[in-house]
A protein has these predicted regions:
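C-terminal output helix
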Residues: 109-120
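Active-site beta3 strand of CheY-like receiver
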Residues: 48-54
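Short hydrophobic/Thr-rich beta-strand motif most characteristic of the beta2 strand and flanking loop
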Residues: 29-36, 44
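Charged docking surfaces used in two-component/phosphorelay signaling
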Residues: 19-27
Length: 121
């Protein structure tokens, strides 16, 4: 994987979280784009066609679960890797994420270095 061509879409309604997670990924050379909710994420994903979407579950306007389901049905972006990053760590939340089509589910808080390591793997 070439970090310079690898596009990541980070989606969270908390600007501080987007900034904390974006910084180390950008320092590693990844192309990082951000969105604040599921609706923005879908629109941006169609435009930039990211390799990975890191998606919060609980957001206004459209939550991550619904956004994931819509992404999986869109042939243009359906093969995009999707990782949920959520404060909801209950089994039923993780199961809902995987049932929606997620490839991975990580619970917050996550150290930015750990996220970078997961992206690289």
């Amino acid at each position: 994987m070439d970090a310079k061509t690898f596009k990541i879409l980070l989606v969270d309604d908390e600007p501080d979280i987007l900034e904390i997670l974006s910084y180390p990924l950008k320092n590693e050379g990844f192309q990082v784009h951000t969105a604040n909710n599921g609706l923005e994420a879908i629109k941006l994903a169609k435009d930039i066609q990211p390799h990975l979407i890191v998606l919060d579950v609980m957001m206004p306007e459209m939550d991550g679960i619904e956004a994931c389901e819509i992404i999986r049905k869109d042939p243009k972006i359906s093969n995009t890797l999707i990782t949920f990053l959520s404060a909801r760590g209950e089994d039923y939340s993780k199961i809902a994420g995987f049932n929606a089509g997620a490839d991975d589910y990580i619970t917050k808080p996550i150290k930015p270095k750990v996220l970078v390591s997961k992206v690289k793997s």
